[in-house]
């Protein structure tokens, strides 16, 4: 049974690579634009695959439009990938926006901002004269 899971994982990794190639080179839909395939989760019976993608866009409406275009083009992408992979059953593709990368970047920026603010506060505290010391002109 563990072998079955490793097979689905291997197929998911290969599917991720092939989809990334197909989306960059063979898909000419201008609505999709630049897309990154982050992960592919394949079901045990290989009938379905969830494809997690990110875009270089932050506007939620643009992201939804690109995701809708990808899901509309999913059968065509499936056909192109099926020609590149040797599987008896090619999973149906469902594209899902992966917000984890964006959230990770947002959290990293927040941590960096807090560190900068903390260092700025420490710098101001160190500049103040202590008791018994006077400022020299």
UniProtKB/Swiss-Prot annotation:
GO terms for molecular function: ribosomal small subunit binding. SUPFAM superfamilies: Ribosome-binding factor A, RbfA. Its main location: cytoplasm. Pfam families: RBFA. Keywords: Cytoplasm, Ribosome biogenesis. The keyword ATP-binding does not apply. InterPro entries: KH_dom-like_a/b, RbfA, RbfA_dom_sf. GO terms for cellular component: cytosol. It comes from the Bacteria. GO terms for biological process: maturation of SSU-rRNA. The keyword Signal does not apply. It is found in: Cytoplasm. One of several proteins that assist in the late maturation steps of the functional core of the 30S ribosomal subunit. Associates with free 30S ribosomal subunits (but not with 30S subunits that are part of 70S ribosomes or polysomes). Required for efficient processing of 16S rRNA. May interact with the 5'-terminal helix region of 16S rRNA. PANTHER family: RIBOSOME-BINDING FACTOR A, CHLOROPLASTIC-RELATED. HAMAP family: RbfA. NCBIfam families: rbfA. Belongs to the RbfA family. Monomer. Binds 30S ribosomal subunits, but not 50S ribosomal subunits or 70S ribosomes. This is Ribosome-binding factor A. It comes from Shewanella amazonensis (strain ATCC BAA-1098 / SB2B). The gene is rbfA.
